[in-house]
């Protein structure tokens, strides 16, 4: 096994959950699990979604990203229509997004779109891939510390 994944610094950042309403889902997670909004909501017109990030505390290993549609042509509308929502994707941060994408393609993943800046990550680039087992992963470049 290659040591490249370790060099790329993959770290689980959040679990994305498709919801019809940020408000209702936020209230449910607050009352049921004690989660609270730690960032957002953000409207992201490029992704056609509105998102909020929730956690129990700032030190949580991974957050929950609630994803609601922004507009009628939002890509998550089909999931909401079929399943009513639920787990949508896993997001991993990486030290080198471009190298991570090359590595993912070498592992049989499919790149769904070229990297774009994301509002929720202060303009850091994100990319979407499907794994060979049909899992949707979001990759986000780590913050620059230069």
Where are the model-predicted features located?
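Short, structured motif recognition centered on aromatic/hydrophobic residues
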Residues: 12, 16-19, 29, 54, ...
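Short, charged/polar surface micro-motifs in flexible loops or helix N-caps
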Residues: 47, 59-62, 72-73, 97
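Vicinal oxygen chelate
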Residues: 2-8, 19-26, 52-55, 64, 70-75, 82-146
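Short connector loops at helix/strand junctions that flank enzyme active sites
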Residues: 49, 59-61, 82-87
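N-terminal beta-strand motif that seeds the catalytic metal site of vicinal oxygen chelate
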Residues: 1-26, 85-92, 143-146
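N-terminal strand-loop-strand beta-hairpin
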Residues: 35-59, 119-121, 130
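Short secondary-structure junctions
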Residues: 31-43, 107-116
